[in-house]
Amino acid sequence: MATDQPVTGSRPAWFTAALFGMIVPAVALVALASGPEAASLAVIGGPVLALGLMGAGMIAAAASGRLWIGVALALLVGAGFLALAKGLGLAGGVPPLATGAAMLIASVSFAVRGALFARSALDKGWWIAVFVVAGEAAILITAAAAPGALPDWLLALLPAQWANRSIQTALGGMGSLAAGSALIALAGTAAATLLVAALWPRRWPYVIMFSTWLALSALVYHYPAPPVGGSL
């Protein structure tokens, strides 16, 4: 899926994608891994990978107007973080299929939202993506650093948290089905968002998109993924 606009040459847009998608998560991973009480990869990797995939996928898709660019960049970022984690001695025994499936579904879901921002707001779409990423990242980091500080219903509304929990359970060796509700929510909202983008500028598909988001949030709330012990 592509917009009618050419790929933006805006340096701030691509710098922001690199900042949220690569620099901040990489620094966080190194800092957390080198701490006096380094947490397991399942605890660190979930929020870090979710932030990286969201920042790279959503902002890149919004900046370029190309869904595939967002997906490709997000997956490259995810692979890079796993390689970095391995170099730091954290990534022993990562389940490849479950982790890869969670990363792929999350990458597509984030990139579809970015592509919709590009289609609806044209060359300003990446600004919307930045604000969305910043807001979800703030809640994601708070939830990871202080478990229980935020209500479960709020976390159930966040696609970033869906990605976090699906990646956490995969890295923890629990398999994809353990976070089935989160994966279904990511895939379902991606499909609904893709429908809105495909039918733009018609506005009625937004009703389907928001209804799908609320319904799938309820699914995640009532059927949460099993917790992975520890905090950042």
Residue ranges, per PLM feature:
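Alpha-helical transmembrane segments and their short interhelical loops
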Residues: 59-123, 194-198
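Long, hydrophobic alpha-helical segments
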Residues: 19-35, 39-59
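Alpha-helical transmembrane segments of multi-pass membrane transporters/translocases
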Residues: 11-29, 173-226
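Transmembrane helix segments
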Residues: 124-154, 221-223
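Membrane-helix interface and helix-disruption motif detector
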Residues: 33-44, 63-66, 87-98, 120, ...
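Short, Lys/Arg-rich, polar N-terminal cytosolic tail immediately upstream
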Residues: 1-10
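Membrane-interfacial helix-loop-helix junctions in multi-pass membrane proteins
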Residues: 140-199, 227-231
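Central hydrophobic cores of alpha-helical transmembrane segments
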Residues: 73-77, 126-137, 157, 206-216
